[in-house]
Amino acid sequence: MSLKLAFGGKGGVGKTTVTSLIARTIAALNKGTSVIAIDADPVANLAAGLGIDETQPITPIAELSDLIAERTGAVPGTMGGFFTLNPKVDDIPDRFSIEKDGVKLLVMGTVLNGGSGCICPEATILKALMNHLVLARDEVVVMDMEAGVEHLGRGTSGSVDALVVVVNPGKRSRVAADKIRKLGKDIGIKNIVILGNRVKSEADKDLIRESMPDYEILGFMPELDEIVQSDRDGVRPFEDISNIPEELKAIALKLMALSPQ
């Protein structure tokens, strides 16, 4: 199965929890399917949602100085000068990912100088890796993005099967969704959908529907004690993924149906 999904949303809406649950659910429903989860949000912690032990060291790709220097021919932290703009990255997902229950995690990291658009070795590696993951891998790739979609360029965005914007009933998350959709459209993402999270009532669902009438609503996730308690305990929710609520399973199946193969 080949499927490329990006998840965005205002901080605090539960985007990372939703992303991890979708990745785990797809892996469980399709035994043998390769699922790669990309943590591309500097403040996210996708590892915890996937159940990866916090003592297990994870070095973000942007901080692998020796690898970046080897592949680009330039020392990380430098700008300008000459370096390779199309570095070899096809071995990175297998070499530097951590696997748990059929999901491989890759942490992208942050370019510390120059901003996301800087012409520097670290940014070049991250861009090349995202291009490879979206365009060249015949796998399920689930991306936990920043509030925007900065890691995706125009060259890769057309191959993203869906940008899923996670919202709560609150107004601020819905306003943020409008901004994220504009960013997504600007770089060529065609399928942008809404996932309502932490919904407590039919009134919450109606509020999201009525305030976002020109969006496709993928589905709604209820406020769940299991998720709240697992966050307090520092463990992943639904240790037995077969116990996920039907709403989440239905959302995962809808997303899987977007796969071109």
Predicted regions and their residues:
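Glycine-rich phosphate-binding loops of nucleotide-dependent enzymes
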Residues: 141, 145, 160, 193
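Inter-motif core of Ras-like GTPase G domains
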Residues: 128-137, 152-171
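Conserved catalytic network of the ASCE P-loop NTPase/AAA+ motor domain
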Residues: 28-30, 98, 132-136, 156-158, ...
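Switch II (G3) loop of P-loop NTPases
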Residues: 108-114, 118-119, 130-152
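Conserved nucleotide-binding/hydrolysis micro-motifs of P-loop NTPases
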Residues: 42-43, 111-113, 147-148, 170-172, ...
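N-terminal phosphate/diphosphate-binding loop that engages ATP/GTP or pyrophosphate donors
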Residues: 28-101
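C-terminal lobe/tail of nucleotide-utilizing enzymes
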Residues: 183-261
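Walker A/P-loop phosphate-binding motif and the immediately C-terminal alpha-helix
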Residues: 3-42
